């Protein structure tokens, strides 16, 4: 697991990074000044349909709404999910947050490279 420092983020952890013949995938948790962002990235490989388009499905959580939940606890929760058994991490994260009455924003971005 990598942890990187950048100007607009306090912390960034790559939870999972993989690829197959179709695409590359990465699941990332970032801590910014006032929010925590979980994102799942998908980038199709050359020769595949939609090559050149990347997707990011995300969940944004305001730090002020986190109650007693910490970044490290959220990271541990996400790392302990087996995405193959559970159909991914995103829906389980949303259920986890709703169960604790922690509001969040979610969505899907796509862009052309």
Regions found by a protein language model. Give the residues of each.
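Extended, Lys/Arg-enriched charged tracts that mediate electrostatic binding to polyanionic substrates
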Residues: 5
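Amphipathic, interaction-prone secondary-structure segments
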Residues: 9-40
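Mixed-charge, Lys/Arg-enriched low-complexity segments
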Residues: 49-113
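Short, surface-exposed beta-strand-loop junctions and turns on beta-sheet-rich folds
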Residues: 43-48
């Amino acid at each position: 697991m990598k942890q990187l420092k950048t100007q607009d983020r306090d912390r960034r952890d790559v939870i999972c990074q993989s690829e197959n013949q179709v695409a590359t995938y990465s699941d990332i948790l970032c801590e910014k000044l006032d929010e925590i962002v979980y994102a799942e990235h998908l980038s199709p490989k050359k020769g595949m349909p939609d090559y050149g388009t990347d997707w990011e499905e995300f969940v944004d959580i305001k730090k002020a709404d986190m109650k007693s939940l910490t970044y490290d606890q959220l990271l541990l929760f996400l790392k302990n999910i087996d995405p193959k058994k559970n159909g991914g991490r995103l829906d389980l994260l949303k259920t986890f947050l709703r169960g604790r009455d922690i509001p969040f924003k979610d969505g899907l971005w796509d862009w052309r490279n």
